């Protein structure tokens, strides 16, 4: 298993992988709006929003004594309003740290998000556009005996294996109220627009363009029960992935609700609809705080790996509100994910 992990790390480091896994994304896409679409920056029913997440995979892999893959992340965003006009902007920032092989390979991602928010004429519809310049740094640990573990030569990794990439993402996002108890949203995101070149020693690979489509809805069945169906489709080169599912929100009190849902992740959806994971989710909202927990239960052939376990994600969100912003959702509707 350890050798298998080293090979995965090496392929990712040399840029020869064509998988969507080149870019960081989360099963709880609905709890990480800035990493899903920069046009969602500033869609906050409050003064500002802080969102944190932690993901790990293969956490019982004994070769390293720690999760083989782990990703903590944090985002911040807020709206800025232009007086009583129908327009505004959103600003935000994202920090992600993706570790592979128990810390042998480290990817650090930092981004600044900017969005333009526009409420349309009848107040039931709005559209936003976002831009997200970012940098991505890849570094090897000095503890990794790269050639020794892969080739048996006993050489150590050199600084030339480290790399830095600068690129930009862009997106657009629409939300609308179709009926008094039915809201919808849809978005399109383009990642890695500059398609920067990744240079590692004498090898070069392109950071390939990826696109993502998001569609979802909020359906109010009663004052206490809401349905939240949604999906995200991603494609990069000839690899695609579909995350789809539905959550049910039960409003316990005016300030407390509980959310349960099930999502399915499928790879190569266009060609063969190959199932990868079933992802149950539970969340709790209380006043300004939301906590969420999900687990990726692998259903693909990879579940037969002897030391494999699925992926666990923990999320925590805080939205700051003050008295004079109590009616902010009348200006910019924030979809309920």
Place the predicted regions along the sequence by residue.
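Positively charged n-region of N-terminal signal peptides that target proteins for export
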Residues: 1-4, 122
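Short, basic/polar N-terminal leader/transit segment immediately after the initiator methionine
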Residues: 3-6, 23-25
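Bacterial N-terminal signal peptides
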Residues: 6-15
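Sec/Tat signal peptide C-region and signal peptidase I cleavage site
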Residues: 16-21
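Subset of outer-membrane beta-barrel
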Residues: 22-337
């Amino acid at each position: 298993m350890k050798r298998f992990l080293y090979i995965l790390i090496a392929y990712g480091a040399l840029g020869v992988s064509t998988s969507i896994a080149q870019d960081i994304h989360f099963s709880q896409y609905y709890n990480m709006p800035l990493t899903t679409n920069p046009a969602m920056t500033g869609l906050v029913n409050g003064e500002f929003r802080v969102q944190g997440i932690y993901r790990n995979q293969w956490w019982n892999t004994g070769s390293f004594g720690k999760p083989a893959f782990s990703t903590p992340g944090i985002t911040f965003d807020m709206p800025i309003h232009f007086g009583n006009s129908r327009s505004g902007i959103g600003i935000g920032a994202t920090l992600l740290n993706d570790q592979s092989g128990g810390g042998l390979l480290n990817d650090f991602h930092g981004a600044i998000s900017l969005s333009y928010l526009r409420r349309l004429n009848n107040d039931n519809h709005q559209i936003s556009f976002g831009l997200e310049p970012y940098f991505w740094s890849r570094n090897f640990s000095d503890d990794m005996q790269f050639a020794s573990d892969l080739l048996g030569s006993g050489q150590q990794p050199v600084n030339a294996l480290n790399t830095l990439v600068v690129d930009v993402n862009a997106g657009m996002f629409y939300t609308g109220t179709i009926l008094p108890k039915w809201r919808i949203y849809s978005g399109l995101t383009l990642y890695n627009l500059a398609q920067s070149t990744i240079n590692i020693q004498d090898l070069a690979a392109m950071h390939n363009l990826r696109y993502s489509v998001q569609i979802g809805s909020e359906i109010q069945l009663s004052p206490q029960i809401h349905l939240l169906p949604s999906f995200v489709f991603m494609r990069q080169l000839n690899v695609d992935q579909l995350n789809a599912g539905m959550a049910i929100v039960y409003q316990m009190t005016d300030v407390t609700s509980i959310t349960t849902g099930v999502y399915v992740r499928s790879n190569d959806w266009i060609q063969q609809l190959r199932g990868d994971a079933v992802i149950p989710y539970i969340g709790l909202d209380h006043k300004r705080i939301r906590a969420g927990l999900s687990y990726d239960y692998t259903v693909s052939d990879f579940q037969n790996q002897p030391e494999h376990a699925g992926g666990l994600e923990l999320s925590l969100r805080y939205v700051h509100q003050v008295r004079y912003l109590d009616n902010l959702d009348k200006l910019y509707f924030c979809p309920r994910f």
